[in-house]
Amino acid sequence: MVIKPKSYKQLAYEEIKENIIKGIYKPNQILNERSISEDFGFSRTPIREAFQRLYYEGWLVTRDNKKNVVREFNLEYILMNQKVRTSLEILAVSESICKFKESNIRDLEKITNEQEQIIKEGNFYNYIKLDRKFHEYIYLISENSVLTKILSNLNDTVRYFGQIALSYPNRQELTVQEHRRIIDAIKKRDEEKAIETMRIHMVNTTDAIEYSYK
């Protein structure tokens, strides 16, 4: 099977969105088409097409007659997003708990151990990737393709808002502790406990986001 190289439009889209998610492009920052095309070494056409897609997905807005403004998500929107995500995360752990094999549990433990090591190294972005990997592994084990697809569509906003939550003091360390409690409940095949520990984990994440917005 021949893998086609990504188009300039796709590369521009991915890079610009990643810069927004990582906070390189700040909320309310105006993105200059010419400047970005020069930075990327692309013509302005793929940059313009990438902007159009980012508008459609809600990452860019027009504000005060100024185009290509990085969207600033208000707290109300973030809390609605978290409410939906919490319900889905609980469903995922509920549907997966009886399907976990010992090897799967070891995989979750390995991810959590890697998170602890990353905290010591101070690699914030790799920590976030591992955090997503932990939750995505649970979705995978659930074998619920609809649930996995919905959560996959939320992935970028989850990463973006997760960075806000993890800026809360000691939140990274606390997240690892909460992940270990979830794993412990899965080991015991205690569905009620797994649901409750996941719910608490998500509530604490939401609280950290609210705190960071104050």
Where are these regions (language model features)?
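Conserved amphipathic alpha-helical segments that form helical-bundle/coiled-coil interaction surfaces
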Residues: 81, 98, 102-163, 177-183, ...
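Short linear motifs at protein or domain termini
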Residues: 1-98, 140, 210-214
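C-terminal effector-binding regulatory domain of bacterial HTH transcription factors
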Residues: 1-5, 191-214
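Residue-level signal for the nucleotide or nucleotide-sugar donor/cofactor binding architecture
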Residues: 42, 188-189
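Alpha-helix N-cap/N′ positions at the starts of helices
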Residues: 65, 88, 110, 174-177
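Short alpha-helical transmembrane interface motifs in multi-pass membrane proteins
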Residues: 74-75, 161-165
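Short helix-capping and inter-helix turn/linker motifs at the boundaries of alpha-helical repeat units
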Residues: 7, 105-106, 170-173
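Short loop-to-helix capping motifs
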Residues: 33, 144-145, 189-190
